[in-house]
Regions:
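Conserved Radical SAM active-site core
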Residues: 1-50
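Auxiliary Fe-S-binding modules of radical SAM enzymes
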Residues: 34-35, 41-129
Length: 129
């Protein structure tokens, strides 16, 4: 399960409870945070240490538009760092060295995009009709 959007550690207690259930079901937990790992470890807010302890993979650092990248999977800007907090994943896993992908689904006259397209990719699809 991935926690992102807003700041997950602002809701650390509630998300730790969810993460506990996810882990109990044998699934992994990935968290995207604008805080760095050092900043999170220094926090004393309720639930922060618990959520960190339940996190398999942390992507830390604020998104920086001037450092935008699509070359690293799941990472939006070059300043963001992947921290492998458990042995569930390893930095040697080839999935972590692939670029981002864009998935396009067309069904029933609707188009759904999932992913992070390279700049200009959507404009090459043409105007909406």
């Amino acid at each position: 399960m991935s926690f992102l959007g807003g700041e997950p550690f602002a809701q650390a207690e509630g998300l730790a409870a969810v993460a506990r259930g996810v882990r109990a079901a044998g699934r992994s937990v990935m968290v995207f945070s604008g805080y760095t790992l050092d900043e999170l470890r220094a926090q004393e807010a309720p639930g922060v240490a618990d959520l960190l302890a339940l996190t398999d993979l942390l992507v830390d650092g604020r998104y920086d538009e001037s450092r935008r990248t699509t070359q690293r999977r799941w990472v939006g800007s070059d300043n963001q760092v992947m921290h492998f907090l458990t042995d569930r994943y390893t930095p040697l896993d080839p999935r972590f060295h692939e670029g981002n992908h864009l998935e396009i689904r067309m069904r029933g006259g609707e188009i759904t995009l999932n992913g992070w397209p390279a700049l200009g990719r959507l404009t090459r699809l043409g105007p909406a009709r």
